[in-house]
Structure formats: structure tokens, C-alpha cells
Amino acid sequence: MLLHIKQVLTSEELREARGILADAPWGDGRITAGSQSAHAKNNEQLREDCEETRALQQLLLRGLERHQLFFSAALPKQISPPLFNRYGGASNSFGNHVDSAVRFLRDGSGRVRTDISCTLFLAGPDEYDGGELVIEDTFGVQRVKLPAGDMVLYPGTSVHRVLPVTRGYRTASYFWIQSMVRSDEQRRLLFEMDNHLRHLRSQYGETDSGVIGLTSTYHNLLRMWLDV
């Protein structure tokens, strides 16, 4: 499932993030790449342990906490600490690759199975040319270039790439989610059911017998498929 989530960050939060990024210490993005993706990766990245990264992580996670759509779609069990990258100039692209199945946390606190990959755009599409995120999966080939503050979720199993940036700079955050429901197909079905339930609640109310019955079915399926 590929999902566009709008306005994860407010305009005020975006201004704050851009202010932090303006003075951030960018370095070679290959330091976090796996053995295969290191050959394809040509971008810049903030160090995981720098003050700017920590401030941006708190800002982004606060934004995620507000979004019911995000929780409905991802059913997150664990979210890896968000990282931040930049494409432009001589460091302007990332060739075809698949994310590693497991992300080991830098502080040694554990690991995250990368069920879902996430990219949150911090630069608007008018600020750079090129830089589309191209994702290949069962839904076909999708080219993604979103407004600043918007985010895309897609399966961690997808082959994807970032096309060369030929003008300006493309800044973004990226991170991974270990979901309580491992299967992408099962998550999609639960997400669709949850969307339909919200519509039915708005039409018929919480006490309608059909709404209660479908809510029970949703939670029974969730209980069956949960990996906690």
C-alpha cells in the first residue's frame, strides 16, 4: 500500500525545521547505507547524534502523533528515529535499491523491522527540479514529489530510487516503521475497513447495530493478525 498523508507538519513547524536545517552539519549519506545501497547512494545526511537531528526528530514525531490517518494505516509498533537527507549539487541522486529488512538503532536500544518506509518532504516541489521518489511494487511504478510537510508511506519491500536533482536542494526526513501487523495486505484491509467505519459512524452514530458489529469484526481481525 502506498499512501500520501497531507500536512504532517504545520507551516509554523516547517519554518522551524528549515531554520534548523539552514545551519545543520551535512555529511556523506553513505555512512548509513547497507552494502548494496551504498553503491547507489549519492546524497548528504545529518549525523544521527547531532543536536540538529535530535531537535528535528522531536518536531517530526510531534507531528505524527496528531495524525489519526497515520496510525490507522501504519498501526505502528515501533518507529525508528527519523533521519534527514539532502539532494543537490554533486550529491544529487540515489539509484535503485531495497531498504534493509532490519534497522539497528544507533544507541544500542534494539532494532526495527522495516515493514513500512516513510519519506516526509521538507522542501516544496517548486524549490528543486528532479528529485522524484520512484517506487516500484505491486501497485506499479509511482513517481512521488509532494508539498513540504507531506509524507508518503510505502512497503519496505519496494524497489525505489530518487531521481537526480538538477536545480536547488531536496531536503527530506526518512524513517521506518515496524507495524503491529506485519503483512502489507492485511494492513491495507484493516485500513480500508477503518475508513469505512469512520464514514458509517458519521452517518449512523456509534450505537448503530451495524456499526457495532463491524467494529467488532475489525478488532477481531486485528487481534488475529497482531504481532506484539
UniProtKB/Swiss-Prot annotation:
SMART domains: P4Hc
Keywords in alphabetical order: Dioxygenase, Iron, Metal-binding, Oxidoreductase, Vitamin C
Cofactor note text: Binds 1 Fe(2+) ion per subunit.
Cofactor (UniProt): Fe(2+); L-ascorbate
Xref: Pfam families: 2OG-FeII_Oxy_3, PKHD_C
Protein EC: 1.14.11.-
Residues covered by the Fe2OG dioxygenase domain: 78-179
Cited NCBIfam families: PRK05467.1-3, PRK05467.1-4
Name assigned to this protein: PKHD-type hydroxylase Vapar_1809
Organism: Variovorax paradoxus (strain S110)
